[in-house]
Amino acid sequence: MRRGLIARSPVELPDAVFDARLDRVRAAMRDAKLDALVIYTNNTRTAGVSWLVGFVPYWSEALLVVPRDGAPYLVAALTFRVKTWIERVSRIGEVLHNPRVGLKAAQQIASLQKNAAVGIVDFDGLPAGIADDMREGGPGLALSDAEPLFAALRAKADPADIALAGKAAAIAYQALSQARGARLNGMIANAEQQARLDGAEEIYLAAAPDLARDSRFMRIEGEVALGNSFALRATVAYKGTWVRLVRTYCDADIARKAAARFAQAVAQLPSDSGFAGFTSWLVEGCRMAQPLDPLIGSRLGEGYPPLPGALVSVQAALAIDGQTVLLGAPALIGRSGEASSLIADPLYD
């Protein structure tokens, strides 16, 4: 199903967007004296490759190779029969097929320069078998971790990122707005149907069915009884951009008070000072390949504070008049001297 929902939009992501991103990557590669950059992708680690070429795998795995000079190419474990689909939904110079993607990628790089300097994004997160295959396929290649290089490039959202996050947030908001009814499963079904109709590539819905008992989100299987107040969380992907929104079903006055405190806290990010008095909070965003990496939060320790201009999704829990309220929405981190801002309304009718 997901494959059928993935499509390239030359209006929302024109070639110039990918060209500008690749130009920035290649400039950083020249500074770091790298001959090639390699990014791993699978159906859970989509954000690095989709950001550069628009490819989003619906299953299996692949390596994107970005030469310092030349068009990027994809080495995919998917069979040759999906070659035309990959070419249709992404902007890639060539698609190579091999079940051992690391071996083929290294052989291809080494065929042009046997001692090439190759940076691997999130080297520590690369599956060991693929890393071993790369060493076998290119024994003379100098492999290094390119995490700092790529994370610095991904830290700041460009205008296309912001536009797509706004569209994804609108889809998630409308989905949660349609989550109505007396039974939780029916509410979830209504929300998912709305998101699919609005073009979501993916939507994951989780629930906290009774906030008086437990504020943790869970995947719902079977029918679950609802408490007097409960919450739904929608995680939505659109054109490779992921956001999270949270809706708490509670007294309207309590919801308004909670939303105001949440917006005030978000405005002070990346400082955590606004979340004083909150039960818990979490800021997620894309650093490399995971679309929603935990960055900072009440339970994370030092973490990775988002830089000015970063797109993030924020979740928080707080008590208003003794009642637990969960909130969540995407936000844009302000630049120097600017406040950060939500890009979706945390209040629902």
Where on the chain are the PLM-derived regions?
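Active-site neighborhoods and metal-handling regions in enzymes and metal-associated proteins
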Residues: 1-349
